Design a protein with these regions (language model features):
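Right-hand nucleic-acid polymerase module
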Residues: 1-115, 125-249
Length: 249
């Protein structure tokens, strides 16, 4: 018997399966106790999955992944950077509001390997020249999202950004990322399956393929029970194998 959670987010479907113990542990069986390192890795994985669903549900081809940098001679303190970022987002909101649209974004602030603070965002599609005009502090590096709707690699990139300065050790406080208000958060469909186990190699439903890099099987550090995870992605008509597996960098 196992618990299955299904999340539908945009063009993707996430499947999470977790074995359920039929009988309580006996007095002789040890209670599972994960190490702090295992729990930290597990929590980071959950954060990555949550952000993936948020991106897959709310963004699409033509939206942008951008990096806001600072000129070498004008690198701000953490508080100044926070203020500059807020002013940039206000300008973006005004830009979209004037066009009868609503700004969608997810952002995070991070440090580079050499200690340069910068901002990463996934944002509604906007002309590059307008973006640069709203950011006078340095370069705007913009990359359009592809149309696969499968943005977990972008989520992985966000979650693994440096949160502490290599030079000073100063940490960026708060959440790993900050979303705009009103983004849709896909709810799970939860089912208890009576089968003793699941298929070792999962099969996609009609009209989808399984991203092979998303498949995970192992022991859940929280419960000590087996689990399986994978993500199905909607097939794009006319696309073939490798082309539909393009990756967002």
């Amino acid at each position: 018997m196992y618990l299955q959670k299904t999340y539908r987010a945009g063009k993707t479907i996430e499947i999470q399966k977790l074995a359920i113990r039929r009988h309580p542990r006996s007095a002789r069986q040890k209670r599972h106790s994960p190490t702090p390192e295992a729990m930290a890795a597990y929590n980071k994985k959950l954060a990555e999955r949550e952000l993936t669903r948020l991106l897959d549900e709310n963004f699409h081809g033509g939206d942008l992944s951008i990096v806001l940098t600072y000129r070498k001679g004008g690198r701000p303190s953490q508080e100044q950077a926070k203020d500059y970022r807020s002013k940039f987002l206000r300008s973006c909101r005004d830009y979209f509001h004037a066009r009868g649209e609503k700004l969608r974004y997810v952002e995070t602030t991070a440090y580079g390997e050499r200690g340069a603070i910068h901002h990463h965002l996934v944002i509604s599609g906007i002309d590059y020249r307008d973006l640069q005009a709203m950011w006078p502090h340095g370069r705007v590096i913009a990359t359009p999202l592809d149309d696969t709707g499968n943005y977990w690699r972008l989520a992985h990139y966000f979650v693994n950004q440096l949160r502490a300065s290599p030079a000073t050790g100063e940490e960026i406080k708060g959440r790993r990322w900050n979303p705009s208000k009103g983004l849709r958060r896909p709810p799970p469909k939860t089912e208890v399956r009576e089968a003793r186990t699941w298929r070792e190699e999962p099969k996609p439903i009609k009209g989808y393929y399984i991203d092979p890099d998303s498949i995970e099987s192992g022991i859940c550090p929280l419960t000590g029970e087996p689990y399986q995870f994978y993500r199905m992605v909607m097939l794009i008509p006319g696309r073939q194998g490798k082309e539909r597996m393009r990756r967002n960098q």
